[in-house]
Amino acid sequence: MEDSSLLSPISLLTIVIFLFILNLMMIIQDFSSSFPFRFHLFFSNAYILFTSIRNNKQNTELPIIKKVVVPNRADIKTSVEEVKAIIDDSEALYECLIEEGEEYLLEKNEMMGKEIVKEAFRLFDENQDGFIDENELKHVLSLLGYDECTKMECRKMVKVYDENRDGKIDFYEFVKLIEKSFS
């Protein structure tokens, strides 16, 4: 019986060829990804040389690719310290933004709430006189499906929130009514 755990020389050769082809494909891919840049660099240099020869310029500088400078250990140490300082600054900025963001959202929520209350008041105040009387209240309640509500009941509802006893609810009283109903 043959031991299947041993690799035959043919299978080893197949693996080596496969790895060689894979390596070649990676080299070609690296070259092809940088090819457009090299193509552009070659033709831009050729154009610069051609125009300098045509214009009789002697010292023409060609664009070159700069080499990457690897920092020494002292530079790395400094940059690590700088990174720590940046992280500390960013944490402080984050905390500040969170606090200001919460305040902004609360203010925005209050503003939106006020706009919603104004719009609700406008819906109740059909004749736009700045007051909600018992007739307007009855009409809106009937639109909302409360048809069984009588004029007398509407008058009682208005009377509960009518602080100045004029028989109508003004915007200030309406805001208080809304605040009481949500608290």
Curated annotation (Swiss-Prot):
Sequence ranges assigned to domain EF-hand in this UniProt record: 112-147, 149-183
**Annotated InterPro entries:** EF-hand-dom_pair (IPR011992), EF_Hand_1_Ca_BS (IPR018247), EF_hand_dom (IPR002048), EF_hand_pair_protein_CML-like (IPR039647)
What transmembrane ranges does the database entry give?
A: none
Residues annotated for Ca(2+) 2 binding in this entry? 162, 164, 166, 168, 173
Question: What SMART domains would the database entry show?
Answer: EFh (SM00054)
Q: Which Gene Ontology terms cover its molecular function?
A: calcium ion binding
Q: In its keyword annotation, does this UniProt entry include Zinc?
A: no
Residue numbers binding Ca(2+) 1:
125, 127, 129, 136
Q: Which keywords does UniProt give here? A: Calcium, Metal-binding, Repeat
Q: What does this protein do?
A: Potential calcium sensor.
- According to UniProt, the name of this protein is Probable calcium-binding protein CML47
Q: What is the lineage of its organism?
A: Eukaryota, Viridiplantae, Streptophyta, Embryophyta, Tracheophyta
Gene behind the chain: CML47
